[in-house]
A protein has these predicted regions:
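Catalytic domains of carbohydrate-active enzymes that cleave complex glycans
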Residues: 1, 22, 35, 117-219
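N-terminal carbohydrate-binding/catalytic regions of secreted carbohydrate-active enzymes
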Residues: 1-29, 34-37
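Extended ligand-binding groove/face enriched in aromatic
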Residues: 2, 27-135, 174-176
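Well-ordered alpha-helical scaffold segments within catalytic/enzyme domains
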Residues: 11-25, 75-79, 90-108, 137-152, ...
Length: 219
């Protein structure tokens, strides 16, 4: 497996959401559902809500560190430690697009949508990379507000927005170094983050805030 699976799978979920909206392809919808289930497994398999797995693979029987055996429902899998800021971006991007496509209105995916809501709230409440003030916290609280319509999450997201908006309005200032070499990893992560925030601003605006204008300026 790719050691950056969480990030790339989130981007793939978004691509299949876009594809489905344009074409109505059943294959795109099936791809999205299968892939977002993988993202949620990253959250669930570790047994510790403060962390998440970086990637998964089929069980080998005796995994060396940093791989660990799954248990219970996930006994057929192994997971790799190291879920971090970069991988978090992919998880959030994928969950946001899956909820927007499948869960805003009845689509016959009630069980999957309940699982999405559970994982999103666990991220907002417990995941270590989403607790300190910063854009990860903004993403977690805003997505939780969107999927649950819970006012407490909305208040926390709005408060965090006021802190992060000046930074977001300036864009990703690390994409070019002084010698002119682009930071392609940083560019991609910034793009994923701005796309996710733009989706949230469209689907669940923060009260009294024109987040879209700030994000467009940053982009």
């Amino acid at each position: 497996p790719s050691h950056d699976s969480a990030l790339w799978t989130g981007a793939y979920v978004a691509s299949q959401a876009y594809r489905y909206r344009v074409t109505g392809s059943p294959e795109a919808k099936a791809n999205l559902i299968r892939s977002v289930q993988g993202l949620m497994t990253l959250m669930e398999i570790t047994g510790d809500r403060r962390t998440f797995a970086r990637t998964l693979r089929a069980a080998t029987g005796n995994p060396p560190s940093p791989w660990y055996p799954g248990t219970g429902l996930y006994a057929a899998l192994e997971w790799k430690e190291g879920g971090n800021n970069d991988m978090f971006k992919g998880v959030m991007f994928g969950l946001a697009h899956a909820h927007a496509l499948l869960c805003e209105y009845p689509t016959g995916n009630d069980q999957l949508c309940a699982r999405i809501r559970f994982n999103v709230t666990q991220i907002a409440d417990n995941l270590s990379v989403a607790q300190p003030s910063g854009q990860n916290r903004l993403a977690a609280q805003w997505l939780a507000a969107y999927v649950t319509r819970n006012f407490s999450y909305l208040l926390r997201a709005t408060a965090e927005w006021t802190v992060q908006a000046p930074i977001l309005s300036q864009g990703n200032v690390t994409v070019v170094y002084q010698d002119g070499v682009a930071d392609w990893s940083g560019t991609h992560l910034a793009f994923v983050e701005y796309m996710m925030f733009s989706l949230l601003a469209e689907r669940y605006p923060l009260p009294g805030i024109d987040a879209g204008s700030t994000l467009r300026h940053g982009i």
